[in-house]
Amino acid sequence: MSNILMTLAEERELTTPDHFAVKLKVDDGDCYDFSDELQALGHEVFFANWDDLKGREFTRMFHDNAKAFIKPPPLSTMDLIFVYKMEGFYFDLPRFFQMVETFAAAAPLVVNDPRTIRHNIDKRYLLELEREGLLVPPTRLFDETVRERLAKGEPIVLKPINGERGKGVMLMKTPAELDAIEGHEHEYLAQDFIPGVREGERSFVFLGFEYQFGFLKRPSNPEEFRCNESQGGTAVLYEPTAEEMEFALRTLRTYESFGCPIHYSRIDMIRSERGPMLMEAELINPSIFARYFDRGEDFGKKIAAYFHGLLKS
């Protein structure tokens, strides 16, 4: 029997003494699917709100087997820590990194791996993948060529180097629009705008290198280019073509070659005239939309089996 801790975004107003309320109802279902399956395999499962980490220990912890809040056991007693649903961590990166380092020092297994988290949180990984030959939208650090290209009528997408769920991503069409980020230009990557993104992103979920399921994310309206759920995007089930599957696996293999272990991931791509084009490799706590497709229970079994295998190996 192993101890497994999951960090979750909590809806404190809805939490009761015998129920840890996850921020979104859809996520609540996913989290409990994982937990039920892990318990069926003989593991002890604990939930914690990352806001409750003080120093190197949590001040509150929910023991899901017992359906009760308990005195938090030391993190050193955890065999696996799953950095899962977390709200707003991009707005407090120093504390987030401190948490990840605390987990790495305390537990033999952290998913996703701290090395992968540290690397993936910086969107400049897209430049590295591009250098390795993967097709991505032409990407560069913000420089004066951005203003020059906008003056020529070429739209540019600005993407925060540290950001999540499409927040802060902007489509710029004129130099005057750059006033919105004046003084913060160094915090952005600049990408060529690829019109094909309006057709939607193809997203594929993996555990390790094993494909789980895929879905097509679409923007909320013809004028929107972001497909993120937080921006009103929708999703439908979608199965990858052979070319898309090979591209996704190549992306993961390339990322692993950077010294970043691969566990739980989502690879986002679009179609282009040159073939699949990578938009993001989500390797921190990717949204998987499982409940939207009634895949929560099935995926819960698979992720529980995956964690069980990690703990046995």
Show which residues each predicted segment covers.
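Conserved residues at the C-terminal ends of beta-strands
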Residues: Y84, F142, K217
